[in-house]
Amino acid sequence: MLILRLLDEEDMYGYQIVQEINKRSEGMFTLKEGSLYPVLYRLIEGGLVSDRMEIVGKRLRKYYHIETKGKERLKEIRQEYNNIITGINKILGT
């Protein structure tokens, strides 16, 4: 969900995704690039995300882009997440 959420804001390259998750979570999630790429590959295989190569300065960088199917799945996941949080809050009485 976190990766799709970030890509819903803008196309990003792998290291940028890692840095953004670490930054926004204030260090609560310390995602490593080695953990990220298998997830990205599964998202690509599922048609949720696509990738493209772009030259930035003298470097070739791979950017990831959320597709329509990914946006739809993100919406579903967010609804599921909200339902879970609502249920937990009812149980905890908050």
Short names for language-model regions:
Residues L36-Y37, L43:
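Basic amphipathic alpha-helical segments that dock to polyanions
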Residues I44-L60, H65:
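Beta-hairpin "wing" of winged helix-turn-helix
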Residues M1-S35:
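N-terminal helix-turn-helix DNA-binding core of bacterial DNA-binding proteins
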Residues E72-T94:
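Amphipathic alpha-helical dimerization/coiled-coil segments
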Residues R59-R78:
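Basic, amphipathic "hinge/linker" alpha-helix immediately C-terminal to the N-terminal HTH DNA-binding motif
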